[in-house]
Structures are given as C-alpha cells and as structure tokens.
Amino acid sequence: MTWFIDRRLNGKNKSTVNRQRFLRRYKAQIKQSISEAINKRSVTDVDSGESVSIPTDDISEPMFHQGRGGLRHRVHPGNDHFIQNDRIERPQSGGGGGSGSGQGQASQDGEGQDEFVFQISKDEYLDLLFEDLALPNLKKNQHRQLNEYKTHRAGFTSNGVPANISVVRSLQNSLARRTAMTAGKRRELHALETELETISHSEPAQLLEEERLRREIAELRAKIERVPFIDTFDLRYKNYEKRPEPSSQAVMFCLMDVSGSMDQATKDMAKRFYILLYLFLSRTYKNVEVVYIRHHTQAKEVDEHEFFYSQETGGTIVSSALKLMDEVVKERYDPSQWNIYAAQASDGDNWADDSPLCHEILAKKLLPVVRYYSYIEITRRAHQTLWREYEHLQATFDNFAMQHIRDQEDIYPVFRELFQKQSANQSA
C-alpha cells in the first residue's frame, strides 16, 4: 500500500497563494472597505475578521469585445414583440440588480450583480488596518538597549544532539566517504572480473590462474563490504546560533478625561480611540509598555480594565494627569533609556486657571523628554482655553500634535493622521 504525505507549506489551506495574490491585486478596494467597516462596528470587535465587499466592476477581468458603433444584423429567435427599427427601452436603474444602492423603488425588470463579498482573517484585517503606521521619532537610545536574541540557522556542525541531526547531509557525507574509500578497489575489482571472464573462455583452460583471480575478487569484495554504510564521521547536525538584535524600548502613556463634563458618548469615543491605539501598539511593537492614567479632579494610574470600564467620575483638572505622568517618568522611565510617547483624550473642558498650568508642565517638563505627544479633543462645541493653550505648544514644539474628533467616523482617520509612518525625508 502506498502512502502519500503532503508536506506543502500551505497545509490544508491549498489556496493560500491565490488568496495572497488576490489581496495584493485589490488592496486599494479592500482598504477602502475596511475604512468604511471600522466606522460601522465596535472597535472592541476589531480583534476579529471582517467581511469585505468589492464592487463587481472592480474585479472584472479584461476581455476582447466588439467596439460600439457600426452596423450589425442580428437574429433573435422567438421574438414576437419587436420588428426592425424598433427601439428597446433601457431597464430602470436599481431594479432587479444587486449593485444598486438599495434605496430605489422595486422593479419587475432589470438585471445586475451583487458586490463580491469575502471574509478576511483577523491577521489580514489588522495588517491592513495598521499598515503604514508607526510610533513617530522612534530612536535607538545608546545608553541601554534591550537586546532580543533570535535563533538563526548557521550551517552544519559535526557535533550536536540527535534531535538536530540532518539526515540528508549525513547521507551525502556517507555516500562521499564510501565512494572515496572504495573507488580504487572497485576499479581493480572491475579489471579482475573482466580478466576472469576472458580467461574462463580461453583454450586451454587456466585453472590455477582462474583460482587466483577468484580469490583476489573475493578479497576485494570483502574489503568493500567492510566499509561501514554510516560512520560518526559522516554525521552532520543543524547548527543554530542566537544573535542579539537591539530593539528600542518604548512606553506609551494613555491619558483620558473621565470628568463629569464628559458625557457617555464622548467617553465611548475616547475608549474606542484608545482600544484602537492599544491594538496597534501590542501588534506592531512587542516591547512597548503602556501606562493608563484616568483623571478628573485627581489622577490615578490604573490597569487596562479599569481604564476602559470604571464608572468613577468627578470635576475637571487636567494638570493632575500631567503631574502624575511626570512623576511616573521620573520614577520608572529614564528618558535616556526609553522612548516616551503620550496620547491624551479630553472634551476640552477644564478649570480656566488650570489650562496655563497644563501649558507650563508640558513645555518645561514633559515635551523636552517625550518623543511624541498627541492630544485628541472630542467635542462638537467650540474650543475652549485648553485647546488655545495647546495651540501655542503646537507652534513651538515639533513633537506635539493635536486633532479634533467630532463624530465616531473621525476616530480612524485621526488615528492614522497622528501615527502615520514618516518617510526618510520627513524623519530627517
């Protein structure tokens, strides 16, 4: 009975190559569909896949056909409604077809095609969602680098554990050794066998010579057989070595206003932004620490669950969060050893006398030590004192950015704007 073992890299997913080719070919349409989809679903569900629809016209294959114009004579069998020179009315748009907007009137005629819909996996979804995004101004600090050791193949070695033995390379060495050790004997054996065959057919018979040749042939065959099939000299083992790969250390501070002026809709949008940010950081950078700070009149460092789901509320003093961040930086994150980033979300409401203090803390303590500080104001109202104070910071510091979010649909575009990967010219 014959057994076939499928060792293809794709395994059970036989169409992986075709799928990857399809994703590359229609990348623009897929990214557009993802941008629309993220505004229609909760960002807490972003860790799953997505059904993507592409207009049928965008995936149609090129084909040869007759050009418009010219004179043609066609015979349509079974026609009992029209005669020559009759005009046929165009089918009403949106009727019967699946490519319409779905907002028109029903119709009894007309044809069309639905959009092409397929499912992309969680990894494919996140790859497209966070493509071309990076932490701005990421630099490798020289004082202390966190070295990650990755295992790399480094040829073969003659010593190792049985689990790493290379069967193919060992058999190749065995064949080469046996060939080298027996090549001369095999040539001599072939010559003796040829001579024996010649003598055995000669007249008169040479019995003594035949006996001598048979004895030498037997001795040569015994010597060849004594050469071992495999020897410890032949064994080769796959060699692996760990190479240090320096990776930059980064910490992201997430500051969120949970004061009484933040209504539930505003808090939800802030939560969505930070959930998106958290997924981006945890997926793109494996060595990024995240510090969560919630604030109203008082600031507190919390864990991830409390940051998103705690019901605590109060007044509004933004400087309390900035002071706490400064304390945490001094205590745990030396700027010479860490790349420090911060993202702050608020509705813009703040005690009027506190806004100048926020400006002072940022200008003198935080912005000189952080790589990038982003401020997101979530409100439909007019900007207040905090926004105006921060505008002065944006004009002075290159590592400070601010954006305005009015609706849920603004979250993803603002997120991409804040963390767009810089080109070489921009970073220079």
UniProtKB/Swiss-Prot annotation:
Highest taxon in the source lineage: Bacteria
Coiled-coil intervals, chain numbering: none
Ranges of Gly residues composition bias in the record: 93-103
Organism per entry: Salmonella typhi
Disordered: annotated span: 77-111
Protein name, as recorded: UPF0229 protein YeaH
Chain's gene name: yeaH
InterPro entries recorded: UPF0229
Ranges of Basic and acidic residues composition bias in the record: 77-90
Family: Belongs to the UPF0229 family.
Signal peptide: none
